[in-house]
Amino acid sequence: MSKKRLYEIAKEIGKESKEIVEKAKSLGLEVKSHASSVEESDAKRIVESFTVSVEPKAVTPTSKVEKEAKAQEGSVAAEPKAAATKPAGRPRPQNRNFKAEREARAKAEAERRQNNGERRNQNKGQNNRQKDNRNHGSQDRRNDNRNNRNRQNDNRRDNRNHFQNRQEASKSQPTGPRFDFKARAAALKAEQNAEYSRQSETRFHEAQEAKRQAAQAKEKAKKLNQKEQPTVEAAATAAPQAQPQTVEQVTHPAAVDTRRKKQARPDKSRDFSHENEDGPKQNKHKKNRNKQNQVRNQKNSNWNKKNKKSKNNRNHNANLKPVTERKFHELPKEFEYTEGMTVAEIAKRIKREPAEIVKKLFMMGVMATQNQSLDADTIELLMVDYGIEAHQKVEVDTADIERFFVEDDYLNPKNMVERAPVVTIMGHVDHGKTTLLDTLRNSRIATGEAGGITQHIGAYQIEEGGKKITFLDTPGHAAFTSMRARGASVTDITILIVAADDGVMPQTIEAINHSKAADVPIIVAINKIDKPGANPERVIGELAEYGVISTAWGGDSEFVEISAKFGQNIEELLETVLLVAEIQELKADPTVRAIGTVIEARLDKGKGAVATLLVQQGTLHVQDPIVVGNTFGRVRAMTNDLGRRVKVAAPSTPVSITGLNEAPMAGDHFAVYEDEKAARAAGEERAKRALLKQRQLTHRVSLDNLFDTLKAGEVKSVNVIIKADVQGSVEALAASLLKIDVEGVKVNVVHSAVGAINESDITLAEASNAVIIGFNVRPTPQARQQAEADEVEIRLHSIIYKVIEEVEDAMKGMLDPEFEEKIIGEALIRETFKVSKVGTIGGFMVTNGKITRDSSARVIRDGVVVFDGKLASLKHYKDDVKEVGNGQEGGLMIENYNDIKIDDTIEAYIMEEIKR
């Protein structure tokens, strides 16, 4: 069977949902609200229960005598009640909700009409028999109502009670299943007309009554005036106070009977806002027309003459308030100030007038106004003059992240727990650092590095014996010195890996220096012991020369011989790391807000700015507001070294985060703030300071460096744009290019950034005539098309030293070429031939080297160069040839020279470009 909801049943029978719910509960149905469903049979039961309750009651005939007695009884009872409750002064009626009353009356009228229709259908015969009695009774009721109308209108409260009784009666009447809107509209209109009629009739009778009272008061006053003048004056002053309503009514024109009109003109002296059907009238923006017929002549105006007083009288009679004396405030004993406080602020703090402080400053020789800022020295002198001990307020710089790393009270010693050691693997190029890390993590990351060089720092975490170890892998190339220095600053232990066959190399020495500068213990891993030429003892001896002495030799450095390729002695190396970490007692407070260091940063095309962070103290959570270097943001997502999403990062944990508005610099510190607003303010302030610092580094032209600046204009430059995959590579590449030393040419890095090569880079390169160098990145398809159209050169590389070589060659090519003279042969003139219109031909024999067609020639006579020029033609017998070898004969002509003589020496030479 189908089900129906309770509100559908209520809609069908014209009932409220609340009544349907109550009826259903009374019938024993389990329902909760109007949206509950019931079976079809239960729905019929509910409808039938309402049908039974609305059946009309039998009409009991009422005799004319009973009706007259009832009406007479009601009128007799109403008269003493009205007489007893009628006050001396008519009270102002309270506002009522007329709209709700009108709807209730209309609803009651509609239900009454419908019930009357049903009664007519059921009791048609009975109604026909009593038709005469009903008509006669209706006529009697109309007469009774007409007689009692005046008494009902005398008291407004009775009228209101009458409406309330009618409303209660209408509510008690049963309602039909359907609602007649036409009947409701007719009842509404009839009620409005009746209301207007009652108001009009009430006003008419009130006006008549006021007129009679005014005439009586006037006649009484006239009689009293004839008897005694003082008594009249007293009565005249008392009359307006005793009857303010009556006197005010006289000023209005005589009331007219307007009962036949739908709405009479409202009485301006009374408030009829309660009779407005939609509530009180809003007369805020309407003009006041209560006295619109009065003459408004300003010169002859006599309004309020009795109450007017002259200015002199008002001034003399005014009660002058005594001047309140200012309370004397004691000066404070101490005053905490900030530099730049104004005079007004100081006056407010010490409870003194600004004029007093300005006067004191003037006596001290300082000209100031109350809105002028004062420096610290002036404020202290002023406080000394007042006898107040002044001390400057120490303001905490919220933009200073470094304070979290040096403040002792930031960490709670009671909450300190043991943390994982951070280990940095350092060593020379291709000594096996990434291979060792690959062996530790059981992955093949090492094979993916180009040229055997780790291009950027990687941070990984492994577990050994139930304890975690965090590893940082640093590049070995000389260009990545700054990255190795950053790695040493955040590490706890350094693993110095040295190849057993190569020994100590330049980057090995550099790694030792970084570790010693950071005061980090060194564990030496001698790698490649599986090779035939391995000599670990030689490595130990070489390291001892640089201060890294083995514990076997009485030093403090642990030495472990390993083979990263075959995994030999790896467990021993990890145990050594944990042993050194245990000696150091590494601890962190996980309860504070997280602080740490940026290991690496890059710009991802889909994710935006991505930063690899190492949490050093506290715990980093997703959605934490964070300031990283000179940028800020909120941690949107966080992934660990395995690429898995995590929500929490404990101390010594490397994570990669997204949500920053820019890519930070590698090595920057980060800190979590209490809310995003504070983080934004700190980040913007740090960015502003960095920009200001960068501008201050810009050199200005002065008389001292003017000559150097003009001379620098002669120096040519190679403009380059650097784009790399990570920030560390960008820094290293830019630093390496700037170090290239080619006389007369310098490198100018126009722009460097992280991310793929895009259209804006092409536009910038075209405008600045620059070469774009992409390091481990590729141009977008749109950028590639634009580069081809604009003829912009893009060089893509994955190994840094190849980039350096290529740029160095380009720099050398920008210099003007230098040539040197190279003598390739000599010849002796044996005979000369003069040909008309051609010139002099010299027959020669090559005595040394060779004579070529494109070479230059000098004519030497008696050891003196008489001419230097180019060959016009070269022949061997009658054939034109390119060269004539040693011992051969030939003929030649020299451009613009015909004075060749026998025994002249011809020296052939070429100009060769000197390679730089």
Curated annotation (Swiss-Prot):
Q: Where is the composition biased (Basic residues)?
A: 305-314
Pfam families noted in UniProt? EF-G_D2, GTP_EFTU, IF-2, IF2_N
The primary location reported for this protein is: cytoplasm
Fetch the InterPro entries from UniProt.
EF-G-like_DII (IPR053905), IF2_II (IPR044145), IF2_N (IPR006847), P-loop_NTPase (IPR027417), Small_GTP-bd (IPR005225), T_Tr_GTP-bd_dom (IPR000795), TF_IF2_bacterial-like (IPR000178), TIF_IF2 (IPR015760)
A GO MF term:
GTPase activity
Quote the biased-composition stretches of kind Low complexity, using this chain's numbering.
77-88, 227-250, 291-304
The family database entries (CDD domains) matched by this protein are listed as:
IF2_eIF5B, IF2_mtIF2_II, mtIF2_IVc
User: Which residue range or ranges hold the tr-type G domain?
Assistant: 418-585
Q: Which GO terms describe its cellular component?
A: cytosol
Region listing for G2, in residue ranges:
452-456
Q: Where does GTP bind?
A: 427-434, 473-477, 527-530
Query: Known SUPFAM superfamilies for this protein?
Result: Initiation factor IF2/eIF5b, domain 3, P-loop containing nucleoside triphosphate hydrolases, Translation proteins
Looking up Gene3D superfamilies in the UniProt record yields: 1.10.10.2480, P-loop containing nucleotide triphosphate hydrolases (3.40.50.300), Translation factors (2.40.30.10), Translation initiation factor IF- 2, domain 3 (3.40.50.10050)
Q: Where is this region: G3?
A: 473-476
Q: Where is this region: G1?
A: 427-434
Chain positions covered by the region annotation G4 = 527-530
Region Disordered, as annotated, extends over 55-324
Q: Where in the cell is it found?
A: Cytoplasm
Q: Which family does it belong to?
A: Belongs to the TRAFAC class translation factor GTPase superfamily. Classic translation factor GTPase family. IF-2 subfamily.
**PANTHER family tied to this protein:** TR-TYPE G DOMAIN-CONTAINING PROTEIN, TRANSLATION INITIATION FACTOR IF-2-RELATED
What does this chain do?
One of the essential components for the initiation of protein synthesis. Protects formylmethionyl-tRNA from spontaneous hydrolysis and promotes its binding to the 30S ribosomal subunits. Also involved in the hydrolysis of GTP during the formation of the 70S ribosomal complex.
Please give the name of this protein: Translation initiation factor IF-2
Tell me the organism: Streptococcus mutans serotype c (strain ATCC 700610 / UA159)
**Lineage, highest ranks first:** Bacteria, Bacillati, Bacillota, Bacilli, Lactobacillales
